[in-house]
């Protein structure tokens, strides 16, 4: 008798295969004795799993710096030794995913999973920051399809909303799934998603962070390289 497909069964998609392709490629970039920033999200999790396989098979001496509770759990399961940011001194390489990648500037929007604050700290402190994406994440200009997430201190959420409205953006408090009320980050803050067009990523990143009450935003203007999974190969984009 055939098994009835359940609503929560995961069916692999073309996007999933492209994510796995870039994850495998990225894992090969890690060298012995490196400290590696471990990003968060579906693509980053695949990278973490592939890196764990390399550590076991090749007996590599590597430490990972997780950017969320989720990446910490995935890394622990994969057998990657973990170290905190204040213990490592420096990070050799950070590997992370993205929600949008601007093809011309390699600026990013991240934070669909609400982890962008810790991701940005780790990614920006790394000597090299590499992003993994499937070709569907490439855009001509940031903000066309994906909102910019802001991590906001709960005390200031209403004033931040008012400020964003005055800037002619369309802000919305991110609601949780599986619970009533707003999404709460690993650091205990709220997420406001902002729909806006972005002409200059660096200026927008600075402007949003200058709003009192905003801890960090999901515009990443700094990225060294992007590995893009396509149906034919993994393309490498550089500035």
Swiss-Prot record:
Substrate binds at residues 40-43, 96-99, 110-113, 137. InterPro entries: NagB/RpiA_transferase-like (IPR037171), Ribose5P_isomerase_typA_subgr (IPR020672), Ribose5P_isomerase_type_A (IPR004788). GO terms for molecular function: ribose-5-phosphate isomerase activity. Pathway: Carbohydrate degradation; pentose phosphate pathway; D-ribose 5-phosphate from D-ribulose 5-phosphate (non-oxidative stage): step 1/1. Its EC number is 5.3.1.6. GO terms for biological process: D-ribose metabolic process; pentose-phosphate shunt, non-oxidative branch. GO terms for cellular component: cytosol. It catalyses: aldehydo-D-ribose 5-phosphate = D-ribulose 5-phosphate. Pfam families: Rib_5-P_isom_A. Keywords: Isomerase. The active site is at residue 119. Catalyzes the reversible conversion of ribose-5-phosphate to ribulose 5-phosphate. Belongs to the ribose 5-phosphate isomerase family. Homodimer. This is Ribose-5-phosphate isomerase A.
């Amino acid at each position: 008798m055939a098994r009835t497909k359940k609503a929560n069964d995961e069916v692999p998609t073309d996007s999933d295969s492209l994510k796995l392709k870039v994850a495998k490629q990225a894992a090969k970039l890690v060298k012995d004795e490196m400290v590696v920033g471990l990003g968060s999200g579906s693509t980053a999790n695949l990278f973490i799993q592939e890196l764990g396989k390399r550590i076991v098979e090749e007996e590599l001496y590597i430490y990972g710096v997780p950017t969320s509770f989720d990446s910490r759990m995935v890394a622990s399961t994969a057998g990657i030794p973990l170290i905190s940011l204040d213990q490592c001194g420096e990070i050799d390489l950070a590997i992370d995913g993205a929600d949008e990648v601007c093809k011309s500037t390699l600026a990013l929007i991240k934070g669909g999973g609400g982890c962008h604050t810790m991701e940005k700290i780790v990614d920006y402190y790394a000597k090299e920051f590499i992003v993994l994406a499937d070709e569907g994440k490439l855009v001509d200009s940031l903000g066309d399809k994906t909102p910019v997430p802001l991590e906001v201190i709960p005390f200031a959420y209403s004033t931040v909303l008012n400020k964003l409205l005055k800037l002619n953006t369309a802000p919305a408090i991110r609601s949780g799934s599986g619970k009533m009320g707003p999404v709460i980050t690993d650091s205990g803050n709220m997420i406001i998603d902002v729909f806006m067009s972005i002409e200059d990523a660096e200026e927008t990143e600075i402007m949003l962070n200058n709003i009192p009450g905003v801890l960090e935003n999901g515009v990443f203007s700094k990225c060294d390289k992007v590995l893009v999974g396509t149906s034919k190969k993994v393309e490498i984009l550089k500035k």
